């Protein structure tokens, strides 16, 4: 099932020189976002920069959100990850999609125009309503913190 999402092209090179984000295969969960930079951009070791993608989206449906995730190859091979780890796009946001790129490696990395730098994934959203209680119903796990669910 495909859900229509409104997209606005902010950079005229999208749709002419570079394709609109799309799923690469029928099983793809994410669409690649590209670096729509005017010139090559070098990230020094430890440096973070905000990179335009050339598009804006409006999800509109409050039961959906979008997340911007890193591309595994860039992170593993070059140390390029998202500066904010995950970007959350709320359904009512309508501004440009930007990618915070962080070079966590010890060597400079150069981004070129149109390079695929992140993925856009749409996810379902559940808005919770808190119910105040004095005590929780007991569970086997109880109050065990991080690493307390066992090893097997």
Curated annotation (Swiss-Prot):
Its cofactor is Mg(2+). GO terms for biological process: dUMP biosynthetic process; dUTP catabolic process. It catalyses: dUTP + H2O = dUMP + diphosphate + H(+). GO terms for molecular function: dUTP diphosphatase activity; magnesium ion binding. Its EC number is 3.6.1.23. Keywords: Hydrolase, Magnesium, Metal-binding, Nucleotide metabolism. Pfam families: dUTPase. InterPro entries: dUTPase (IPR008181), dUTPase-like (IPR029054), dUTPase-like_sf (IPR036157), dUTPase_trimeric (IPR033704). Pathway: Pyrimidine metabolism; dUMP biosynthesis; dUMP from dCTP (dUTP route): step 2/2. Substrate binds at residues 71-73, 84, 88-90, 98. The keyword Heme does not apply. This enzyme is involved in nucleotide metabolism: it produces dUMP, the immediate precursor of thymidine nucleotides and it decreases the intracellular concentration of dUTP so that uracil cannot be incorporated into DNA. Belongs to the dUTPase family. This is Deoxyuridine 5'-triphosphate nucleotidohydrolase. It comes from Shewanella denitrificans (strain OS217 / ATCC BAA-1090 / DSM 15013).
């Amino acid at each position: 099932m495909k859900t229509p999402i409104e997209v606005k092209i902010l950079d005229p090179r999208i749709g002419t020189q570079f394709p609109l984000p799309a799923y690469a295969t029928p099983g793809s969960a994410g669409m690649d976002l590209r670096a729509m930079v005017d010139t090559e951009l070098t990230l020094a070791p430890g440096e973070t920069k905000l990179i335009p993608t050339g598009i804006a989206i409006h999800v509109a449906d409050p039961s959906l959100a979008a997340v911007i995730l890193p591309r595994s190859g860039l992170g593993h091979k070059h140390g390029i990850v998202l500066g904010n780890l995950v970007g959350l796009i709320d359904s009512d946001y309508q501004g440009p999609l930007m990618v915070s790129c962080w070079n966590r490696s010890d060597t400079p990395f150069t981004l070129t125009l149109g390079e695929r730098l992140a993925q856009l994934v749409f996810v379902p959203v559940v808005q919770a309503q808190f119910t105040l209680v004095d005590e929780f119903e007991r569970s086997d796990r109880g109050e065990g913190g991080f690493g307390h669910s066992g090893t097997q």
